Amino acid sequence: MARGPKKHLKRVAAPKHWMLDKLTGVFAPRPSTGPHKLRECLPLIIFLRNRLKYALTGDEVKKICMQRFIKIDGKVRVDVTYPAGFMDVISIEKTGEHFRLVYDTKGRFAVHRITAEEAKYKLCKVRKITVGTKGIPHLVTHDARTIRYPDPVIKVNDTVRIDLGSGKITSFIKFDTGNVCMVIGGANLGRVGVITNRERHPGSFDVVHVKDASGNSFATRISNIFVIGNGNKPWISLPRGKGIRLTIAEERDKRLAAKQSSG
């Protein structure tokens, strides 16, 4: 009989987007409980060791973290398996580097460097709005923040911009047609485009149609849509490729062109 939470994670059962090879060990780091789900997060150890190559082993990552060099969303994190997720800002004081976790078009977390100015805020999707004890309204975001007394105009699926120093909402974007969004789940994960229309299906999932910058259209569930800007101006910088997914033939041509120019 299972007693309590699972403490291990086998390498073959780890999320594919962590990109761990299955032959270098049996186990993968199991993320701690935190603001992001196991299959939608990137543990700090994988980011520092496998992505940035700042350490060779887990022990080295631990030594880096225990010196309190790593901040996530402005807070020092010493847990090597802390689950960092979509839109989180990772800052390394010692090197003066800042990263934002956003998806590339293949659905993996890109190592996306940002400026110190951009590292002061993050965008959060509003998951639900409730009225708590004594009639205090509050909203819950995709990264498990609870913010009391929000602007009554803000509704579910809107995006709020949060100042990481104070934790307060500075502005917000309505979920509306014509706004630019990023897909954060499903087969189109990581694609960026403008919302063209929303099909309402009472009792089921609403479907949202999106058109990307190169004119390709696709549809996904409303729960997979994260609005990132007003009109076609995103409020955050995007990783290389700007969220436009290429076809296999286009990728091949791009590779060949790069090979010829370097050769």
UniProtKB/Swiss-Prot annotation:
For the keyword RNA-binding, the answer is yes
Q: Which GO terms describe its biological process?
A: translation
- Could you tell me the superkingdom of the organism this chain comes from? Eukaryota
Known SMART domains for this protein?
Answer: S4
Which PROSITE patterns does this UniProt record tie to the protein? RIBOSOMAL_S4E, S4
One GO molecular function term of this record is: structural constituent of ribosome
List the InterPro entries: KOW, Rib_uL2_dom2, Ribosomal_eS4, Ribosomal_eS4_C, Ribosomal_eS4_central_region, Ribosomal_eS4_central_sf, Ribosomal_eS4_KOW, Ribosomal_eS4_N
Q: Which GO terms describe its cellular component?
A: cytosolic small ribosomal subunit
- Domain S4 RNA-binding stretches: 42-104
Arranged from A to Z, the UniProt key words for this protein are: Ribonucleoprotein, Ribosomal protein, RNA-binding, rRNA-binding
Q: Where is the signal peptide?
A: none
Q: Can you tell me which family this protein belongs to?
A: Belongs to the eukaryotic ribosomal protein eS4 family.
Q: What is this protein identified as?
A: Small ribosomal subunit protein eS4, Y isoform 1
Q: Which gene encodes it?
A: RPS4Y1
